[in-house]
């Protein structure tokens, strides 16, 4: 199981994010990721860095790390633009980009409307996500954020990876029986126990939210966790 960390991008500067990326590479972790939010959920006055520039900077500084948004939300920009963003990032980090995609949900509405963006239907967003995934899947790993059953089924039809947020071990095991799954979620008090559960459920990646102890992740790996 590969280990990744979501960078802290709800900040006034990118310094913290790049420092976390440096520590991840120093500890031999596998990748870093970044949220794709116009502002932190429910906090429109707080800063939020766009994921692709931060990931490009991290990739240029840390050549061993995989990088990707978690997840790039379909519908905020046109499909062709989003495809170009992934390909531009891949030109900086060839072979190291994860194209993680999501359709968003009702919680995304305030952000989109706050920036004057249209809120399209879930069916339209899924259609655009399929177009993007088909365009990229031969060049880089594609993850689709789990959600509605129609979205989960699309991931299986496309033979790409399903990415889940903070799902428990029992439901994970059921999903991994159907196809590849990656997990992302918040840090828990018993980090080694969480990682053991994810590994035993057959998860391919565990990606921890900002604030995780990077050294503790490396320690779990070094004692044979992966």
Predicted features along the sequence, with ranges:
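Active-site-adjacent structural elements that line small-molecule/cofactor binding pockets in enzymes
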Residues: 1-226
